[in-house]
A protein has these predicted regions:
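Short C-terminal tail/terminal secondary-structure segment
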Residues: 2-11, 104-107, 155, 219, ...
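Conserved glycine-rich cofactor-binding loop
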Residues: 18, 25-27
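The beta1-alpha1 cofactor-binding region of Rossmann-like NAD(H)/NADP(H)-dependent oxidoreductases
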Residues: 50-51, 71-83, 115, 230-231
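Substrate-binding pocket helix/loop in short-chain dehydrogenase/reductase
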Residues: 108-110, 114-122, 217
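Active-site helix of classical SDR
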Residues: 133, 166, 174
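Alpha-helical segment proximal to the catalytic Tyr-Lys
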Residues: 138, 178-183, 245
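Residue(s) in the substrate-gating loop at a strand-loop-helix junction
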Residues: 150
Length: 261
């Protein structure tokens, strides 16, 4: 074995790495931020809702981690550039960037979709990922970029043509950026399965516990439960760690074995 390869106990250690996580105030973004912090990373949480990211940052610090909240509109090039510069000004470098911010709009047939709804979905779920990638590449010497995708990006999902198109583009951006930025920066994706965040429940029209339980059965998940934000966080830790040092250009589906729907 190469003596320079990390010892098994160090494979998932992210101590000393500075991570930016967008959309980190709740749901999957919060789960990823918490997981990275638990692995030792310093985390910069970005989102539009200042109160939410400040609360998560405070909780990470209370648990012994280091975190900073930065209010950011991920669809604004200048704001994202300022986010990167703020992270570096506070912590000296940048080594992990997670493009998580996004939204799953209410399901609607493509033929009934307004141009405004299409543009808003693409801006948040596709263009923002591109902005994040090019910004991270500008300021990151070496490191890892993770793009949060969706099962909707790999096949047709009724009523989600706009969202699926954006996530398919995200998968393509992951592959293209990985080839362009290697070997300096690794670029990978995570495609979450059914994780009942508030965004997920709104998109699926789920309002009650009974409806949520019915949805779980309908998804027919082999692992027999919904996913959690921390399930996605665990995958993010792996992809950012030295355990994934030879992995780039991949989008990993984390869905408990269920097919996209």
């Amino acid at each position: 074995m190469n003596s320079a390869y990390p010892a098994p106990g160090e494979l998932f250690n992210l101590t000393g790495r500075i991570a930016v996580v967008t959309g980190a105030g709740r749901g999957i973004g919060e789960g990823i931020a918490r997981a990275l912090a638990s692995a030792g990373a310093t985390v910069v949480l970005a989102a539009r809702r200042t109160v939410e990211i400040e609360e998560v940052a405070a909780q990470i610090r209370a648990d012994g981690g280091e975190a900073l909240a930065v209010t950011t509109d991920v669809t604004d090039d200048a704001a994202v550039d300022a986010l990167a510069r703020t992270a570096i000004a506070h912590f000296g470098s940048l080594s992990i960037w997670v493009n998580n911010a996004g939204g799953s709009p209410a399901r609607m047939p493509m033929t009934q979709l307004s141009r405004q709804a299409w543009d808003e979905c693409i801006a948040l779920n596709q263009t923002a990922v591109w902005i994040g990638i090019v910004t991270a590449a500008r300021y990151m010497a070496t490191g890892s970029i993770i793009n949060i995708s969706s099962g909707a990006g790999s096949g047709p999902v009724p009523g989600s043509g706009h969202y699926g198109a954006a996530k398919a583009a995200t998968n393509s951006l992951t592959q293209t950026a990985s080839a362009k930025l290697a070997p300096r920066i690794r670029v990978n994706g995570i495609a979450p399965g059914a994780v009942p965040t508030e965004i997920f429940k709104k998109a699926m029209g789920i309002e009650t516990t009974e409806e949520l339980n019915a949805a779980r059965k309908a998804w027919n998940i082999p692992m027999d439960r919904f996913g959690t934000p921390l399930d996605m966080g665990a995958c993010a830790v792996f992809l950012c760690s030295d355990a994934a040092i030879w992995i780039t250009g991949e989008t990993i589906r984390v869905g408990g074995g269920a097919k996209p729907r």
